[in-house]
C-alpha cells in the first residue's frame, strides 16, 4: 500500500493529484481514451494494497485482462513484492504470459530506494515494459496506462481473440492496478 496506485488512476481520469493518503479497498473507474487512433473504453480497477485485503486479490486477478504492477521508487519493499504479485497473477490466470507493465511511481522524489536500472532489468527478465511515473507531476501517467492497453491488444492478437466490443463499437479493456 501507499505506492500511489489511486493517485495514478485519479491523475489519468481527473487530471489532478491527490495528496492525502486514504487506503483503497476497491475503486472502479471507466475512461474512454484514443490510443493509436483507436477509441478504447478502459475499465480500471484500483485495488487494495493493504495486506488485510489480500483475499480479494484472486477475484480481481481473474477478471482483469492486464495489470499495472506499481512500486514506489522510495520504497524497496514495494519493489520486492512485485515478484509475488506477478506469480499470483500467472497462477490465477493459469498462464505464463499475461499483459503486465512494471511501473516505478513517485519519480519526482529526490530520494530513491530502488535503482531504475535494476527495475529495467527485472522488467526485461519478465519480458514486460517498464514505465517511470509521477502521479504528482503527471510524468509517464498516460504512458503507463496506454502501454498496458497496447500489451493487452498484442496478447489478444496473439491468441486470435478480438476485444469485446460494446454497443458503440468501442473496444472495452479491463485493467487492474496492483
UniProtKB/Swiss-Prot annotation:
Does the record bear Metal-binding in its keywords? no
Q: Say if the entry is tagged with keyword Nucleotide-binding.
A: yes
Where, by residue number, is the motif Effector region? 21-29
Q: So which domain of life are we looking at?
A: Eukaryota
A molecular function (GO) held by this record is:
GTP binding
Q: Which family does it belong to?
A: Belongs to the small GTPase superfamily. Ras family.
Question: What does this protein's UniProt record list under function?
Answer: Ras proteins bind GDP/GTP and possess intrinsic GTPase activity.
Q: What is this protein called?
A: Ras-like protein
User: Organism, per UniProt?
Assistant: Artemia salina (Brine shrimp)
Q: Top-down, what is the taxonomic lineage of the species of origin? A: Eukaryota, Metazoa, Ecdysozoa, Arthropoda, Crustacea
Amino acid at each position: 500500500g501507499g505506492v500511489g496506485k489511486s493517485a495514478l488512476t485519479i491523475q489519468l481520469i481527473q487530471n489532478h493529484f491527490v495528496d492525502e493518503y486514504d487506503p483503497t479497498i476497491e475503486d472502479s473507474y471507466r475512461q474512454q481514451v484514443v490510443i493509436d487512433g483507436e477509441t478504447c473504453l478502459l475499465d480500471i480497477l484500483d485495488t487494495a494494497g493493504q495486506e488485510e485485503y489480500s483475499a480479494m486479490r484472486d477475484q480481481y486477478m481473474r477478471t482483469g485482462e492486464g495489470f499495472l504492477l506499481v512500486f514506489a521508487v522510495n520504497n524497496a519493499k514495494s519493489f520486492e513484492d512485485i515478484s509475488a504479485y506477478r506469480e499470483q497473477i500467472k497462477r490465477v490466470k493459469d498462464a505464463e504470459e499475461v499483459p503486465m507493465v512494471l511501473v516505478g511511481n513517485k519519480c519526482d522524489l529526490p530520494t530513491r530506494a530502488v535503482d531504475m536500472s535494476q527495475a529495467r532489468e527485472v522488467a526485461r527478465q519478465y519480458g514486460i515494459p517498464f514505465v517511470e511515473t509521477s502521479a504528482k507531476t503527471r510524468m509517464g501517467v498516460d504512458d503507463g496506462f496506454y502501454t498496458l492497453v497496447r500489451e493487452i491488444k498484442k496478447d489478444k492478437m496473439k491468441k486470435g481473440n478480438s476485444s469485446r466490443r460494446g454497443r458503440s463499437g468501442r473496444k472495452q479493456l479491463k485493467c487492474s492496478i496492483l
